[in-house]
Amino acid sequence: MFSKLVTGIDMLLYSLSNLTKKNLNDYCFIDTASNRTTLVAKDGSLISIFAIHGAKKIVGAEELEAIQEKFSSELLPIFKKQGHQIQFVFIRDPSRVKSELKRRLDPYWKAARNLKLDLDDLFQSKVDHLAKYCVYESCYMVAWSRPIVIKAELKDDQAKNNELLTGLPPAIGAQSSYRLYESLENKHKAFVDLLENALRISEINFKLLEVKEGVREMRKSFDNDGTSDNWEPLLPGDKPPMSVKPKPYATELDIGDKLWQSISHQVFTKNCEIVSPDTIRIGGQNPTESTKDLDSSDIKYVASAYMEVPPQQTRPFKMLLDQLDNDIPLQISIMIEGGGMEKMALKATAAALLTIANGNNKLIKESIEKLREVEMNGDTVVKVSINAVTWANNTKTLNLNKQTLIKVMQSWGTTDTMLCNSDPIEGFTSTIPGFSPTSPANPFVAPLRDIVPMLPLTRQSHVWEEGAIIYRTEDGKIFPYQPGSGVQTTWNYLIFALPGSGKSVLMNSDNFASVFVPGATEIPYIGIIDIGPSSSGLIQLLKDAAPENMKHLFVYERLKNTIDYSINVFDTQLGARAPTPAERQFLVNFLVNILTPAGKEPFDSSDNLASAVITEIYKYYADTRSGNPKEYIKNRNAEVDEALAKYNINAKGMNWWKVVDTLFELGEKRIASIAQRYAVPLLEECVSIAERTAQIKDIYSKPISDTQETLIDRFSRALSENIAMFPVLNNPTQFDLGEARVVSLDLDEVGKGGSPTDDKRAAIMYLLSRYIIGKNFKLDDSLLKVSPPIYHQYHQERIDKALRTKKRICIDEYHNTGSIQSIRRQVVTDMREGRKWNLQVVLASQVYKDFDDATREISTGRCILSGGDSYRDIQKAFDLNETTAQIVRSRLTGPGKGGVPFVFSVTTKTGIFSQYIFNTISPTEMWAFSTTSEDVTIRRMLTAALGAATARKILATEFPEGSIENFMKRFLKEHEYDEVVKSNPYKVIVERLVKRYKQL
C-alpha cells in the first residue's frame, strides 16, 4: 500500500514538472509510434510526416493557379471543422550541402572503387565545385489529427485506456501506448489518404515517411552534425534496451529504463540554453564575451521570428526564397488548422457587443462577414501561424542573418514580422517537423485557397534520390540523376542541341555516370557512335583510371573504310550455326538498306527477299549432310595455324566448323572465334544464293521497274556496288573489340551525311557500328537453339550474365542518318525491346525534327538544350506546359560559368517530370573530358610525368576554365622570340608545372 502511494506521488511530481517548460524534453509532443507511418502525441493526437519533394513540372503563374485550385478543393471539406491540421516545414541549410552531395553520390563513388577505377579526385571535385552553386533544402508536410475529431467517442476510448493501465507499473522517461485512441486511427488514415490524393492530383512528388525516417529528420533538424544518415530511433517493435540508468523520480517499481526511451531524449542530444529573448544556444560550453563572435563547429546559435500581422497580399513561397541568399540558413513552419470560422466565433460575438463603443470593431465584424461569404461561396477559412528560425556558429553572423530574415519575411506579401520575445526554445522546436502542434506565432485566419501559393509545394522536384551525376536547379536545389535506373521502366533518351549548346559535355557526363552500377562487379556494356573525337576524353579518363589488367576494356577507335577494319555482319556467336532472332532482324535491316536506292523508299518485299537469302545462305554453308561447309585452308590465319600445330592437329580435309569445335573443346575460345570468321558466309556470297535458289527465283523474278529489272537483279547489282564502295564489308572480320566494355567508334571519316548517296553511306556505317558494339547485347535462350550442345553451358553462362548486365547504345549526330528507314527501324527495335535486354538507347542530334514520330513517341527522356523560334513545335511534340515552353524559347543560352542550362523531361513509373536544370561540371571534369588538341597534348604529357589524378588536379588548379587554349595564345605571344618555347611550348609548360608541383 505504501509502495503504491509513493509511486503515485512520484508520478504526480514528474507530471507537475512537465507543467512548466524548463526541461528541453518538455517541448516535444511526440510520445511513441502507432504503426509504420503514424506517430502518437502525448495528448493522443496522431501524426504522419510527408517528405515533399516538389512539383513534377516547372510552375509558373498559370500552373500555380491550377495547383492552388486542385489542392485546396480536395481539402475544403475536412478543414471546415476543428481537429485536423497540417504543418509545412521548409529547411534550407548551406552547412549541409557538401555532406548532402556526398550522400547522393556515395553509392556510385563506392561502385567506382569496387570496379577498381581510381576516380576519387573526380568525385571529390564534383562535391567541391557543386557546393559553390548548390544549397541543401528539404520540405515536410505533417498531418495532425487531434482528439477533438472524435469528441463523441473520446470518453469511451479514454476509459478503455485507463482500464488497460490498471495494475501496470510506472514507466517514467519511456514511451507509452496508453494514449492511443482506437477511434482516431480510422479518421487519421482517411485524412492521410485525402492528403495523398490532393498531392497526386496537384502533381506534387512526395513520400509518406516511415516513423523512423520521420524521427530521424526531427533529430537532424536539431543536430544534423551529430546524426548519421543511418541513425534510427528505438520504437515499439524494436528490442528495448536493458538500461540501468536511473531516471528522475524513479522508484524500484519503475520500468521506464527497460523500455524504449522517450523520443525527446533520443532527439535532443545536446544541451540547449536561452541566451536572449529571441536566441538560444545549442551545444558547446558557455562562451565568453570575447569568444561568442568566433566560429565554433560544436555550437549553434538559433534566433526565432514569427509573423505578427498577416500578409496584405498572398505571395508565392518562391518570392520568399528569391529574396534570401543561399548562404543564409532558414527553417520556416507554416501551420494550418481547420475550423477557422469556429475560432472566429468569439471574436464575432465580442465585436457585436462592442460595435457601438468602438468603430474599429465594426471593421472586425465586417471582416468576419466577408470570411463567412468566402465559406458560403465554397472555400474554407483556416487558421494559419507562421514562424521561422535562422542560425549561425557565432553571434555576429547570427545578428546579420536574423536581420535579413526579418526584412525578407516582412516583404513577403507586406507583413509585420517580430523576433521572438518570450520563449525562443519553443520558437525553434515548433519549426521541427512534427514536433509540436502549436506555434508561438500570432494566428490569423484566411481562405484556404489564398494560403496554398504561400506553401513550399512547388519547388522543382528531383526525380532520383541518388546518382553519379548531380545536376542543379537555377537557384541551387540538388538534382541527382542516374541513367538506366529502376526509376524508369525503359530508358530511351533524345538529346537535341544546336552546335555550341553543351551537348557533348552533357553526353560525356551521362556516359560517365552509366559506368557505375551499385553492386555490380563488372563494367557495363556502353557503345558510343559519334562523328568526331568528343567522347575520346571519356575513354582516356576511364583507361587512365583502370589498373593495367583492365585498360583493354576501354576502346576509342576512328573507323576507316579499309580492309584492315573489315567487319563481317554475317558473323555469329561462337559455335552458332545461324543468327539469333535479334541478329537476324539486324541482318534484314542491313540488307534492305543495301538494296534500297539512295533517297528512295524500300521496294515492296525487300525485307522478305533479305530474310529468304539469310535463311538459305546459312543453310548452304552449314556443316550438315545437305550443307556445303567451307574447307579449312592453311595460312589463312597464323594464330589458328599455330594453335592447331600446338595440339598436333592435322586439319587437312577438315571444314572450318570442325576446326572451330575442336579448338573450343580444347579451351581455346578466342582462337576458335577467330577460326569461325572463315566458316560463316560473306556478303558477296549472297548474290549466288539469291540467283541459284529456286524458291527465291520463283518468288522474286518479276520486273520491278520499266527496265525489266527484277528484285533479284537489283539485289545483285546493289551488293556489287556496295562491295566496291565499302571494302570494310566483304572480308572476314579483322576489326575486333575483344573484351572491350566501353567503346567509342568515331565515324568522322565514314559517317557524314548530306546528299542522298552520302546519307546511305552514313546509314551503312552507322548500322555497321551498331552491329560491332552491340553484338553481345541481345543474348537469350534462342542462342542455344542455333548452337551445338557442346556450347550450351558456355553460352548459358553468357546469357545469364548478359541479361543482368546493363547496356547502353549512344548515337550522336543522328541527323547524319538522314531518312534512311533501315537504321531508323533498327533504332526503334532497340528502343522497344530495351527493357527486355536491359538496354538504354540515347540519340543525339541538332534539332528535334531529326527524330521521327516513332522515336519521339517511345522516348522516355528528352534533354532540350536549345529551342529558340521552334519552341511551339517542341512544346507540342513533347507536351510541355506554357512556362516550360517559354524557357525553351529564351533561357537555353548555352554553356556559361554556372554550367549548361537545359530542359529535362523524363517519363518515370510515377509520372512525367519536366524541369529546368543545369549541368555544372568541375574544372577537373572539364579537363578529363576535353578533346582539343592542345588540351589532349598537355594532359597526356603531364599524366606521363605525374599520373592521371595528379595531372588533372594540377590542370584544374592552374587552368580552372578547363582548357589551356587561351593561356597558350598568351604564352606564345609573350615568348615569341624564345626559340626553346617555339620549338616545343608544351614541353616547357609541363616542365614548369612539374617543377612547381614538386616544390610544394
Stretches found by the model and what they are:
Residues 413-488, 503, 511-513:
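Phosphate-binding P-loop/Walker A region and its immediate neighborhood
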Residues 55-56, 90-102, 108, 517-624:
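Switch/coupling segment of Walker-type NTPase motor domains
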Residues 3-23, 219-355, 423-453, 498-500, ...:
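C-terminal regions of RecA-like/P-loop NTPase motor modules
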Residues 345, 477, 484-501, 506-511, ...:
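Conserved P-loop NTPase motor cores
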Residues 84, 523-525, 739-742, 804-808, ...:
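Loop/turn-to-beta-strand initiation segments
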Residues 1-426, 430-435:
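Extended, folded cores of ATP/NTP-driven motor/assembly subunits in large transport
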Residues 621-744, 748-751, 759-775, 895-1000:
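Conserved P-loop NTPase motor module
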Residues 60-64, 69-77, 464-556:
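Glycine-rich phosphate-binding loop of nucleotide-binding enzymes
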